[in-house]
Amino acid sequence: VGSVMRPVTDSHKVSRAKLSYLIDATAAPICIIAPISSWAAAVSGFVEGEDGFSIFVRAIPYNYYALFTIAMMILITVWNFDYGPMAKYETNALKGDLFSDSKEEKDTQRTFENPNGRVLDLILPVLVLIVCCVLGMLYSGGFFSGVDFVSAFAGSDASVGLALGSIFALLLTILYYCLRRIMSFRECCDCLPYGFKAMVPAILILTFAWTLKAMTDSLGAADFVAGTISQAAGNLMALLPAIIFLIGAFLAFATGTSWGTFGILIPIVVAVFQNTDPQLMIISISACMAGAVCGDHCSPISDTTIMASAGAQCEHVTHVTTQLPYVITVAAVSFVTYLIAGFVRNVLIMLVIGFALMVATLYVIKQIAGNKQTA
């Protein structure tokens, strides 16, 4: 994304710090609410004794951090304002300084242009991938054996469905590129190892997360925490989603991995609420995912943060410091929303309240930032 969008944002005088934030904000926050993703498969695998994929889908409307991050990107773009350190970089970008760090651009990536390329050549493979993954998940759920659509999707094996969908989408994409003579079959095959290499870190993180989960399970951590909370929390159970959100955020920030946070917290959340309050369990699982993504989003040692700054060719420290006020703003609004959601558990009402808080918060910040600029 960074290599594709750099020429576009440079021509519109958008700073590299702003570009890196937009890349980072459209990475994990989008993946965590996308049913057709490896994140859905990972989260589903941490929910034992339950329909993991169904729980993931039901938790999407309660994932306030991801939803509010998207809303924030839209609002600061439409209202055309920035605050914190980002404001300085955007002001300098309008004057032609896209970096503001006294360092010249080091574009070490080679750019290849194909005169026969079209926009459809980029969009069509993505659409084919989505369709194939959906069909793969329906196949794993028994849809083509007579199971109805809803039951097949809810009972699907996300890992199998995504793997099948990816394989067929890859084959169709290679066939399409060869027929369009954009790339030869050999060139397509030469690109495959780079895709495999790109997934190695994610596979290692997931493997370590499963290992950590197995260790906590062997120690009986989930049962211990569940029993302790059930005895001590009492009427304060409604506050747990907000508390879980904070714990997940701090844990992911310290470790730099959201998937590892999933592996630790989700089994504990399921053990606490599974037999007592299923609705609060959904909200708490979503709070766990939201907190993990929040901490991962702003952690300087997170792989997504590092890749975002590298993709935008922005200094890593600059990216971390400029996006931190934005992350804290969304995290604060999400925390307040989870506090209310523990008592008001209606999906639509909470979405209205949450988005209203987000808009009001940004409006106040916009007014304060505007007053500082005119002062």
PLM feature spans:
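Core transmembrane alpha-helical segments of multi-pass membrane transporters/permeases
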Residues: 117-126, 131, 154-221, 238-250, ...
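Transmembrane alpha-helical segments and their short flanking loops
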Residues: 36-65, 73, 149, 275-278, ...
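Transmembrane helical cores of multi-pass ion-transport proteins
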Residues: 6, 10-12, 16-20, 25, ...
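Membrane-embedded alpha-helical segments of transport systems
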Residues: 19-43, 57-78, 120-124, 128, ...
